[in-house]
Structures are given as structure tokens and as C-alpha cells.
Amino acid sequence: MSPENLNVVRWQQGQGFLLRPGHAPQSLSADGVSLPENTCLALPSDRVRNLTVPVAPEEVKHLRRALPFMLEESLLEDVSELHFAHAPLRDGLQAVGIVKRATINEWMEEMPEPLRDLPWVTEALCLPWSAGQWTLLFESGSVVVRWAEAEGARVEAVL
């Protein structure tokens, strides 16, 4: 998947919207979802936590099993109730996404089948970003923020 001319399906509160460069957002119905190439599924950044984790080269092969225990002390939830996804960045860093398993199950039940096979990413990581810069998207009642290559969140606007 290339970040150039990326098509994004934004999933919020059981509804999908296709966002394509140069086009108005298109609501997706459960029937007949037809998606262009180079499309990813953007999930709510207030439901998925993104962070960057340094990982020694010898730990990478066991990272899938070790990650929950590496981060356990920094999390409020029981790690057995969470799903951890990771991808290599550079220089021994891993991009990590953490979400409740129950939340994934909710999404899988409510979203049309063609969306389930798309690459999943948080909406904050779909915002443009450059080193040393923050990108903010102001929406009704909240702000989506990206502050690093693999980090971002949705926060209430009153904060």
C-alpha cells in the first residue's frame, strides 16, 4: 500500500465513508461496497492507542508474544483483554497499535465484509505528517492529532 493518493475508508460509529483525493466523501452502504485500489480502513483514534516502541533486534522474532508484557506496566487494562499490532519503522523502532479485543469484535460484526480485509490503521495516522510538526484536524467536539511517524490520537476539543 502506497501513501501516495491513498484512499481511506473512515469507520465511525458503525458507518463507513470513502475518502478519495479530489472527491467528496462517499457514504458506504452494506450492499455493493466497491473500493478502489490503494485503500485502507481508518479506525477511530480514540479507540486505538498508537505508540513507538524501541525493540532490540534479537527481540523482534518474539515480539508478538512479548509485546503485551513489555507494555503491561504502562497500560490501565489487563493485557489479556487487548490486541497488539506492530510494524517495523526504522533503527530498531516498532509502530504499535493497541485496541480492546471487544472493540475489534464489535467492528467485525458491524462492518461490511469487504472492509475487513483492508489494511487497518488509525485515523490519526492517515493525516499528513513531517518531522518536528504536528497535524490537527478539528471536528465537531474533538480534534484528531498526529505528532509523530506512528503516533496520534483523538482528543476532546475542550482539552
What are the language-model segments listed below?
Residues M1-L159:
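Hydrophobic/aromatic-enriched cytosolic interaction surfaces used to assemble or bind macromolecules
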